[in-house]
Amino acid sequence: MADKVLRAKRKQFINSVSVGTINGLLDELLEKRVLNQEEMDTIKLANITVMEKARDLCDHVTKKGPRASQMFITYICNEDCYLAEILELQSGPSAETVFVTEDSKGGHPFSSETKEKLNKEGGAFPGPSGSLKFCPLEIAQKLWKENHSEIYPIMKTPTRTRLALIICNTDFQHLSRRVGADVDLREMKLLLQDLGYTVKVKENLTALEMTKELKEFAACPEHKTSDSTFLVFMSHGLQEGICGITYSNEVADILKVDTIFQMMNTLKCPSLKDKPKVIIIQACRGEKQGVVLLKDSVGNSEEGFLTDAIFEDDGIKKAHIEKDFIAFCSSTPDNVSWRHPVRGSLFIESLIKHMKEYAWSCDLEDIFRKVRFSFEQPDSRLQMPTTERVTLTKRFYLFPGH
């Protein structure tokens, strides 16, 4: 029976499931009335960590019997093939679960169908929602074995507590609304969650409030049991820094990029010493443009704009040098960055696309190079993303799925 299978796989499920899959399961089970709204809210709000949510969800479903458990298992098989392989689950045509026995201890069992898929795709296979490609265990182990002295170590999933911070300013008192920023925020949050980070999201802040959030984030105790962090800033900007929501010609509400590095350095955030700290900045860095389009920079561009264009632009200052940092900015100094009101920012869109496609096999700097190359093409000459102040001493592999 499905409930017995689910009970047998409870521990593996708790240790392996991602927050994205948990959220998908909750939505599915609510829609099919396996869970009611109160149960769903309890699972989401009464539990802090992903593992706690997973444990509570699994226990709720198994108590409801085989039919509820079968819906749970079927969703995993259909939507998260990586997790289904780890749990050794298959959903047959009759909706009965087939329990697949493990051939060898310590191995990573894949079905013949999955193995064929791995060979075709060079080892990767889609993660939740068919998006992020996860790294098969044997490939992760091979990379680590051959290059461990040159790779930042990652902590084990059950005990690590990765955190990420996203600050997104959309609505301003004196500047235009950043239409399309909601797409960037949603997609970036989902990506980081699938990479194993608990994401803290803060919206529409002044420079002072952004500094306060940085201070609180740097002090989070979870960093002690984390192996890395991401900080993502999306706002209007100019050469001096990132605009707060009250910026105007009279009010210099600007977060200097140096402040970000100072708040996250070894002195202010010792828990992240010798661990990768990745800073992503989507904002303008000045007024110059390679083409003439609507933009998000604060000042007036000397080059004007095209009235029929639907792109808009966004900016920052050079980063402060610190060990184990890497900053990836949406444009070169003094230039604008562009945002589509429906698709979101060109930079964020390309970054997410390449992270999903290559994080399983490439280190972060190599992924960033691929993003830059995507803007080199003739139809993408609007901006050139820039990697700056790189003080990483090793290669940073994300090993998605592990």
UniProtKB/Swiss-Prot annotation:
Residues 1-118, 297-314 form a propeptide. GO terms for cellular component: AIM2 inflammasome complex; canonical inflammasome complex; cytoplasm; cytosol; extracellular region; IPAF inflammasome complex; mitochondrion; NLRP1 inflammasome complex. The keyword Cytoplasm applies. Keywords: Apoptosis, Cell membrane, Cytoplasm, Hydrolase, Membrane, Phosphoprotein, Protease, Thiol protease, Ubl conjugation, Zymogen. The modification Phosphoserine is found at S301. Pfam families: CARD, Peptidase_C14. Residues 1-91 form the CARD domain. It catalyses: Strict requirement for an Asp residue at position P1 and has a preferred cleavage sequence of Tyr-Val-Ala-Asp-|-. It comes from the Eukaryota. GO terms for molecular function: CARD domain binding; cysteine-type endopeptidase activity; cytokine binding; endopeptidase activity; identical protein binding; kinase binding; peptidase activity; scaffold protein binding. Its EC number is 3.4.22.36. It is found in: Cytoplasm; Cell membrane. It is an enzyme of class 3 (hydrolase). The two subunits are derived from the precursor sequence by an autocatalytic mechanism. Its main location: cytoplasm. One of its GO terms (biological process) is defense response to bacterium. The active site is at H236, C284. Heterotetramer that consists of two anti-parallel arranged heterodimers, each one formed by a 20 kDa (Caspase-1 subunit p20) and a 10 kDa (Caspase-1 subunit p10) subunit. May be a component of the inflammasome, a protein complex which also includes PYCARD, CARD8 and NLRP2 and whose function would be the activation of pro-inflammatory caspases. Component of the AIM2 PANoptosome complex, a multiprotein complex that drives inflammatory cell death (PANoptosis). Both the p10 and p20 subunits interact with MEFV. Interacts with CARD17P/INCA and CARD18. Belongs to the peptidase C14A family. Thiol protease involved in a variety of inflammatory processes by proteolytically cleaving other proteins, such as the precursors of the inflammatory cytokines interleukin-1 beta (IL1B) and interleukin 18 (IL18) as well as the pyroptosis inducer Gasdermin-D (GSDMD), into active mature peptides. This is Caspase-1.
